[in-house]
Swiss-Prot record:
Entry GO CC: cytosol
Name of the protein in its database record: Dual-action ribosomal maturation protein DarP
Keyword Flavoprotein annotated: no
Keywords: Cytoplasm, Ribosome biogenesis, RNA-binding, rRNA-binding
Function comment: Member of a network of 50S ribosomal subunit biogenesis factors which assembles along the 30S-50S interface, preventing incorrect 23S rRNA structures from forming. Promotes peptidyl transferase center (PTC) maturation.
Example of a GO MF term: rRNA binding
Subcellular location: Cytoplasm
Amino acid sequence: MNKQPEDWLDEVPEDKNDDDDEIIWVSKSEIKRDAEALKDLGTELVELGKNALEKIPLDEDLLAAVELAQKIKKEGRRRQIQLIGKMLRARDVEPIQTALDKLKNRHNQQVSLFHKLETLRDRLVEEGDDVIPTVLELYPEADRQQLRSLVRNAQKEKAANKPPKSYRQIFQYLRELAEKQ
């Protein structure tokens, strides 16, 4: 048997002050969490529509994989999403994540605007002409006469238990005004 002398334990290699040689230890759990996060990002990409997907900066291979996953059902889709996650590990996902966040934020802003418009419409129908000056302050290009006519018709429809045609038209009119700004 070849025995090493016991003094080999006392030998300490010289320290090199190079930061480039530093090894960063990453736990297996952290690697799994990162892989799962990338797989979730891939799932979000697969769930996007074609128009939204065009706004995300994806290379050809990744875009083809996402489009294929959108066509596949059940178990094959799960495997394809895992492949997309694997492909994302080899890429810089920061621009992709940023573009996704912008899309989500735009959607949240639109939902918030719709809630505000619905509240304004409800106030118009309930309180009538008293709220019209508020609407004109928010949207100066609004037509007072058209708005009053829609509000009166909506109130009549509500009193007669008719379908809320004018109620919907008020919302559409308010949405058009909001989009013009």
